């Protein structure tokens, strides 16, 4: 089931976000994977507590909750510089990429990294890879929010359903497959398919 082989079965489509909407996974992923790997990869351990608080604020506890990982990283790095916690070489070019790129994913970042000497691109890619590894290593204790499966079963009788997530495809396939949510979906649209907009 991909985004190129979607076959319309209904006149209506319902798109369901994964992390934080269908799946109760945002807290654990940001506290144990995204945030710690960001601090490690960008050498921010001297300001670990403040940086972790900053990361969680941007990605969980503000209007930017659920932002694409690469855009969230750009916001966090800009705030690190603003607060005087570090100097991020190549940040301006990285920020521009997050605003202009048609796709924000590891393959897209790898392509731009191969054409540039920008250390921010390189660290962002390393951080994202490390984060994916950390997510993959999480115990399979994730779960959908209550009543998600029954609601999806009911909606699937009247509409096509699609998972829409800024997470990577492997994580969404694993989580939605493990909890039988994917069986109701006509498509799993992840960061590799482009932005949610």
Predicted regions and their residues:
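Substrate-recognition "cap/lid" segment bordering the active-site pocket of phosphatases
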Residues: 162-197
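Short, acidic, Ser/Thr-enriched surface-loop or helix-capping motifs
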Residues: 17
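Extreme N-terminal starter segment of soluble prokaryotic enzymes
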Residues: 10-14
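Alpha-helical substrate-recognition element adjacent to the catalytic core
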Residues: 3, 9, 21-170, 185
């Amino acid at each position: 089931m991909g985004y190129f082989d979607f076959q319309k079965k209904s006149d209506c489509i319902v798109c369901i976000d994964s992390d934080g909407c269908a799946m109760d996974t945002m807290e654990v992923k940001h506290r144990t994977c995204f945030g710690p790997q960001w601090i490690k990869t960008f050498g921010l351990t001297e300001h670990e507590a403040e940086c972790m608080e900053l990361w969680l604020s941007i990605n969980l506890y503000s209007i930017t909750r659920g932002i694409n990982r690469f855009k969230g990283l750009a916001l966090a790095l800009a705030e690190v510089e603003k607060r005087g916690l570090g100097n991020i070489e190549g940040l301006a070019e990285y920020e521009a990429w997050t605003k202009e790129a048609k796709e924000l994913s590891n393959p897209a970042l790898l392509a731009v990294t191969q054409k540039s000497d920008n250390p921010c691109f390189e660290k962002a890619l390393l951080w994202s890879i490390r984060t994916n590894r950390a997510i993959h290593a999480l115990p399979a204790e994730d779960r959908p929010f209550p009543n998600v499966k029954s609601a999806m079963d009911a909606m699937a009788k009247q509409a096509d359903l699609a998972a829409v997530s800024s997470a990577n495809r492997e994580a969404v396939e694993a989580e939605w497959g493990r909890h039988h949510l994917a069986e109701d979906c006509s498509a799993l649209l992840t960061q590799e398919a482009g932005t949610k907009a």
